[in-house]
Amino acid sequence: MLKIYPTSLQRILLLTALLLGMKPSYAQNIEEVLAFRKKKPLKISGSISARTTLFSSQPSEARQSFTCQLTGSVNLSLYELLNIPLSFNLNNYGANFSYPSLPNRLSLHPSYKWMKAHIGDVSMSFGPYTLNGHQFTGLGVELSPGRWQVSAMAGRLLKRVDADPNIPSLQVGYERWGYGLKTRYEGSAFALGGTVFAARDRDGRISFDIDALGIYPKGNIALGIEGSLSLIKDLKLSLEYGLSRMQQDLRSTEVSYYHALRADVSYSFLGNTLGVGYERIDPGYATLGAYYFNNDYENLTLNYSRSLFDSKLSLALSGGLQRDDLMGQKLEHNKRFVGSVQVGFTPSEALSASVSLSSFQSYRNLKSSFDYINARTPYDNLDTLQFTQLSHSLDADISWRLKQSEAQTQTLSATLSYQEAADRQGRYIQPGQLSRFMNLGTSYSLDLSVLDLTLTGGFNVSNNYADRKAVLTLGPSLSLAKRFLKKQLSTGLSLSYNETQETGHRLAQVYNLRATAGYRFWGKHGLNASVAYQERKLRHAVSSPRSSFTSELSYSYSF
């Protein structure tokens, strides 16, 4: 960490602090000034790293053979009051392509007390129904004076992507700008907030035919209202509402309005927590402040959780109903029941286990479009086909520390995942519509502290049943890690083999070999290197076995 002492700046700040703090208490202000004087005027801390990767394969693959990346984060602190963090990510990924969102990013995040700014290539979230994590290039601020919270942003959401005749698959697009404001007040027993977000495409200087490609300039205004209320102790109600005004084509006057609503109630009593949630999102709900939206569904959920035996055993239950086709306009209408159970057990520091179960049933009514065309009365389609989709999953893991001493530590662990899905009509599973997936992994680790050596062995088995065929993949893995030079030099070597079988016949074999090395020197510098080789042998391959070689070199410096 770098330390700088600009005496003139220090004297000015000390004098200002003294003049501003004379009134309440002279002795108190003298102590504050003395404490302030002990602080370093300027501290610079952070890290920077550079990485290069070389890739080659036989036969050649459509993958970039050389990539490089420069990343870093730097923080400037003035008297431990004003913080100015700077982060950047520069690379040559896809150097020959144009992106609506740039892979290279440079951002600055200065903060002072309850004020914080975001400058450059950043992202912010106001709520799930307005601005939700969309990257933009511009300026954002977050203010939190007292019980108030104020956030604002303005910037370019998407960069214009022009048509390129040499790349017909390139997704062209408009330059898109967005602006947003969110305010929220947190009271002792309630909270209330509101959000407004607007975005609009700029359709000038485009290089493609709008009507031919069907890519139209869009405009959007999204409003959000949120609030929470605590009626009594441990009882909390929360509500969030979103309204999206979407214009799919700015050249037209047609505008669509969509609504979204979410409400939750939770109550804690005698170590129990009980909650009820409801959410409804209109078909077609979307905003230009998020990359993806789930819509056209209605959820009703019930949750329960409790800890037992001095928190050694935790239990969480949830269940709910979901339906879609809220407007009755789809050919398929789905109703779904979802339930899950999560259990965690930690009887001692050496043993821990967890189990998670989930199950849902989806009821689906299929209707031919001719059923609508030929319908004469509202009752004609009551006997349409009814299907039930079943899905069950199980996840379990256990970790057992067999032995722990100053000389060695032995650990045994295992994980199990199982998933089953099927389509049922009436009481019968449809032919070819049953699938099962199971994965089992075990590992044993031996850490010899005296030798700075760690050995790990494992075995994995996966079984995938679908389309009346069972595919089995299994194989062992072995890794070794050794530290030298008082743990400054770390080395590693790993080997793995797996093969895929179908009805007893071998389909593929995969060999992996990887070596790594990392060296820390002068306390703040790090140098890392790795090489990896993979070979694939396919049963029906015409050519020789496929192989690939990847090497990586990186350097890091922290200060």
Task: Enumerate the predicted regions with their spans.
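Transmembrane beta-barrel wall of Gram-negative outer-membrane proteins
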Residues: 71-76, 139-153, 176-197, 220-236
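Exposed, low-structure sequence patches enriched in small/polar residues
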Residues: 65-71, 101-103, 198, 202, ...
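Bacterial N-terminal signal peptides
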Residues: 13-21
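Bacterial N-terminal signal peptides that target proteins for export
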Residues: 2-13
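Transmembrane beta-strand segments of Gram-negative outer membrane beta-barrel proteins
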Residues: 30-59, 64-66, 80-86, 110, ...
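Sec/Tat signal peptide C-region and signal peptidase I cleavage site
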Residues: 23-27
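Outer membrane beta-barrel
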Residues: 88-157, 273-274, 279-284
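Hydrophobic, small-residue-rich alpha-helical packing segments that form membrane-like cores
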Residues: 154, 159, 163, 167-211, ...
